[in-house]
Amino acid sequence: VFCYTFYIMMLTAEKQALLDFLNSHLALATLVGFIILCFWLIDLIALKTKAFASYRKYYEPVSRYALPIGFFLTLFSTIMSLVYSDYLGVLPCGLCWFQRIFIYSMMFIFGVAWYKNDRKVFDYILTLSIAGLIVALYHQYLQMGYSELIPCPAIASTVNCDKPTFMEYGFVTFPFMAVVTFGYTIMLSLTAKMFNK
């Protein structure tokens, strides 16, 4: 239903309706994804204190399919960022570009690794994800109204980093979506490394 509605709105060129649709639905998906991510993190931490055998049946499939899951997650993020900027005209700020660099890079790394079935890439993915997460958390910090610790890399023709383009539920912004995406790639990498037997 989401894909069909998205496709019809793109064909009919109702850009404002499409923007409202994407903002509300992606914000809800991000919120649900964040809740799942929190439970996943708590569960992986709990694995350190419990026997691995009882949880292995849940995490082995995630580990086995971590490359395609990561590829499609970063591909979706890439497509949505390009739809927002190139089709809907929502200009990215300087910090958004840094986050895009990390996500776009991971999409290609996941894609090539999946094609070659190379499971040794998770150290690289983890490094890119942590760096991207730091940028996204700082960007979210700015957009929640706190003062700059480091100047925004905005130039005259781009958007200012501390002005949210949209905000749903009082805290879901583009940087928060990136936080959740980087969180998932971190958890995928950790799960793949823990259960890569």
Predicted feature residues:
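Secretory/periplasmic and organellar redox-cofactor proteins
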Residues: F2-G94, I103-M106, F110, W114-K197
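Cys/His-coordinated zinc-binding microdomains
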Residues: W97
